[in-house]
Amino acid sequence: MLCIRRSLSRFVDSCPRPRYDTGCTYCEIPKFPADKQIDFDRNLNGTQPETWKHLLILSHGYPSMEAMPPRIELTPATLSSEINAVKRQMLSPMHPVAVSNVVVNNHTLPNKPLGPQEHFVYLYPDRKSIRFEAKDLATFIARYLVPEEKPEVYNPFKQEVEKTQRIQQSSIEFEEQDITDELVLICGHGSRDVRCGVMGPLLQREFDQVLTQENMSSHVKTGQITHVGGHAYAGNVVYFPRKGESVWYGRVFPEDVQGIVDTTIKQGVIIRDKYRGYVNGA
């Protein structure tokens, strides 16, 4: 199992206080039901799911996160359900792949409109946007979501079969582009859990306000993401920088947004008491 750990030298202990009020920086957070309270007790370090790659689906067909079903991976005819059906056979348990559906503001669109049987995804840490036809899903998985196997004991028959498969796969062209924007995604999957349904829109609005104020909105995009684990730590924020691994934060509130922008997005420094990843020595 892959485990990405970060050096303590790249951390600050806590989130800096905001420097100004956008109008909702100090907005009161609505009260949650008794059985849906935010967990303020657990140390967030190590609560991030370990992933080798993170696939973000943009072509899910839902206009907003509010319209997203609670378990889209079980919804027929969605890319999530198609991957879910074959993941045990095709994906490596030692190289886990997270699959999420996202609604992103002002993201880079394909050069031409998607057809009814086409998919459009972002893939990290590859930082690629990829467009492909539904019929080529198996090849897409083999090419992008499975690690290259190490050489095995010589077997002429097996090598010939694998050679044929490689030729077949290599003949399929995927429309692929580099992702140049940075991306901030907030879990807003309200049909799955009310905490994220409340916190997601609040946080996205605050990020949009702060990024505009800081003249960063042209290259840092925001959006909402389906369940990423840890609803009890809402608001959950995942930041995908231009370089390096993604940064996962929990228990983020509107008053924390300026600190995240100033500290993590501008300086590349991680806020330890919000960080859901793994820390050396922690």
Curated annotation (Swiss-Prot):
Pfam families: Suc_Fer-like (PF06999). InterPro entries: Aim32/Apd1-like, Thioredoxin-like_sf. It comes from the Eukaryota. Belongs to the AIM32 family. PANTHER family: ACTIN PATCHES DISTAL PROTEIN 1, ALTERED INHERITANCE OF MITOCHONDRIA PROTEIN 32. This is Altered inheritance of mitochondria protein 32. It comes from Meyerozyma guilliermondii (strain ATCC 6260 / CBS 566 / DSM 6381 / JCM 1539 / NBRC 10279 / NRRL Y-324) (Yeast). The lineage of its organism: Eukaryota, Fungi, Dikarya, Ascomycota, Saccharomycotina.
